[in-house]
Amino acid sequence: MEQAPPDPERQLQPAPLEPLGSPDAVLGAAVGKETEGAGEESSGVDTMTHNNFWLKKIEISVSEAEKRTGRNAMNMQETYTAYLIETRSIEHTDGQSVLTDSLWRRYSEFELLRSYLLVYYPHIVVPPLPEKRAEFVWHKLSADNMDPDFVERRRIGLENFLLRIASHPLLCRDKIFYLFLTQEGNWKETVNETGFQLKADSRLKALNATFRVKNPDKRFTDLKHYSDELQSVISHLLRVRARVADRLYGVYKVHGNYGRVFSEWSAIEKEMGDGLQSAGHHMDVYASSIDDILEDEEHYADQLKEYLFYAEALRAVCRKHELMQYDLEMAAQDLASKKQQCEELATGTVRTFSLKGMTTKLFGQETPEQREARIKVLEEQINEGEQQLKSKNLEGREFVKNAWADIERFKEQKNRDLKEALISYAVMQISMCKKGIQVWTNAKECFSKM
């Protein structure tokens, strides 16, 4: 069954795109014109345009991770990791950085911040958080979320998350984000007071819109398919990398057997002993070097994982668009139904089977006064419906314009970051191979001197 062609009057139409600035690693917070839209609707949460905090260059870092024990909401003891967030103002006069704020946050507070941003900025591809538990691990890597190496990688990921928000032209001005960096006490209460949970779209409603929307925007449909494919490709890449890491670890560690054998052999040789002993030492160094190599690899894997999770952020924007398109179509359908009812009452003809037609046949016609009263009510509802439809159309067009501009910004960022990560990974592999060549060259010299 062919899909009906989109109705241009009922489908959300884009406005001309306005490219946004690309993110920087450090906040250069010259804040200009206020951005209209979701930030202004933030239930009394003001943007940070005029705050002196953003009129300086700010460095944001997650400098430490600390294991702590406390009581949860159920009054049960739990162990968790807290992260120290430091913000520093870079003074232009002498170039020295001055510590302005320092506070501790739990991972759950980072999650709360992101949930808030998703609700109030639905047209933005909100940066993802690093994984809460290790995924795509190879067998020698600990999957424990309290493992020091994993906690360190997550610390780096959380810092990157804050820098992504801080470098975004709209998110950086949000007051809740500012308070996240500066207000340690009662921050959760401040977030909850915005009422963002009540404004969040239900999963059931979003799923319903996905299957029932009649005129989806092809660009957002294609974007959703792209995000699925991107997630699939990066997942496969990470699985392959984990398998390679497993095998590479085994190959390197087996070289430790060379070292042991050469050392044992050197004990029974007089003339060849020194050369064999030296060669064995080089083999031991080679075998132990894989631990640092694979630890470095994890950082590149984490960069890929960030875009694995970005795929879900893209889908969140697409789901919001589907919801708005579905609401628009339902409003148009309701308006058309009321216009038909009004026409039927005015002419006295019923075009289709209806409960009203049945009651008329059973109980007789309405009096002219009753019919006039009903027509008047319907006309008022039609006027309200037309205004509502117009408002939804304008809101939808604004959403498409802002969302597509941010998606273009995200694509530029993605291309730049993934290119850099893949090149760095290739350079690391080349360096690893060169070290292997150097080890065997040294071993060859040892054998030559025997």
From Swiss-Prot:
Statement: the UniProt record of this protein carries the keyword Phosphoprotein: yes
Compartments (UniProt record): Early endosome; Early endosome membrane
Main location: other
CDD domains in alphabetical order: BAR_SNX4, PX_SNX4
Keywords: Acetylation, Endosome, Lipid-binding, Membrane, Phosphoprotein, Protein transport, Transport
Residues modified to N-acetylmethionine: 1
GO molecular function, one term: phosphatidylinositol-3-phosphate binding
Binding site for a 1,2-diacyl-sn-glycero-3-phospho-(1D-myo-inositol-3-phosphate): 106, 108, 132, 154
Domain of life: Eukaryota
Membrane topology (UniProt): Peripheral membrane protein
Region (Disordered): 1-46
Alphabetical GO biological process terms: endocytic recycling; positive regulation of autophagosome assembly; protein transport
Domain PX: 61-187
GO annotations of cellular component type: cytoplasmic dynein complex; early endosome; early endosome membrane; plasma membrane; SNARE complex
PTM annotation (Phosphoserine): residues: 22
Keyword Transport included in the entry's annotation: yes
Described function: Involved in the regulation of endocytosis and in several stages of intracellular trafficking. Plays a role in recycling endocytosed transferrin receptor and prevent its degradation. Involved in autophagosome assembly by regulating trafficking and recycling of phospholipid scramblase ATG9A.
Domain comment as written in the entry: The PX domain binds phosphatidylinositol 3-phosphate which is necessary for peripheral membrane localization.
Family matches, as PANTHER family: SORTING NEXIN-4
Family: Belongs to the sorting nexin family.
Summary of subunit composition and partner proteins: Heterodimer; heterodimerizes with SNX7 or SNX30. Interacts with WWC1/KIBRA. Identified in a complex with WWC1/KIBRA and dynein components DYNLL1 and DYNC1I2. Interacts with BIN1.
Full protein name: Sorting nexin-4
Organism of origin: Pongo abelii
Gene: SNX4
